[in-house]
């Protein structure tokens, strides 16, 4: 169960990162160049509301100083549609994964985003770019369980990531 939670959490992060290139149907070519390169998570905000069991609801924020959670995640985007994600090494040392790196492919077709491998149903997540410039990237991902597969448990959550561009 813990491994499934970690995989789904990583998938949420990865899909959120990849979704940055899709900006509401606008021309995405400029975003590919601006996003290209290596980014590291500077802070992370998570809000979760469980309508089925209120006691499970939570809200928390982490910054780079919280070394047990933030400061290890990084992603490198290439304009050719590939991305390399570096996970926290503790997942590897715990035996959950054999390699801290996961390679992904992404592409945009119209307003739709496609990710491979696809671990989380794209139709339960909505993405928004809150800030994007040469040094900072802020994205917000909103998920809810309106998908029929999840109708037995009603929940909603927001993930907000603030990234800093890695210095060369």
Predicted regions and their residues:
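Sec-dependent bacterial lipoprotein signal peptides
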Residues: 1-22
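Lipid interaction determinants
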Residues: 23-168
């Amino acid at each position: 169960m813990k491994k499934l939670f970690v995989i789904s959490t990583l998938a949420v992060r990865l899909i959120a990162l990849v979704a940055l290139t899709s900006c509401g149907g606008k021309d995405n070519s400029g975003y590919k160049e601006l996003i290209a390169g290596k980014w590291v998570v500077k802070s992370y905000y998570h809000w979760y509301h469980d309508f089925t069991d209120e006691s499970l609801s939570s809200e928390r924020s982490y910054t780079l100083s919280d070394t047990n959670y933030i400061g290890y995640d990084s992603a490198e985007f290439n304009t050719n549609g590939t991305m390399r994600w570096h996970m926290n090494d503790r997942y590897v040392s715990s035996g959950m994964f054999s390699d801290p790196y996961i390679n992904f492919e992404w592409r945009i077709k119209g307003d739709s985003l496609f990710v491979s491998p696809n671990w989380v149903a794209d139709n339960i997540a909505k993405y928004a770019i809150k800030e994007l410039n040469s040094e900072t990237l802020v994205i917000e991902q909103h998920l809810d369980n309106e998908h029929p597969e999840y109708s037995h448990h009603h929940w909603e959550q927001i993930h907000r990531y603030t990234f800093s561009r890695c210095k060369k």
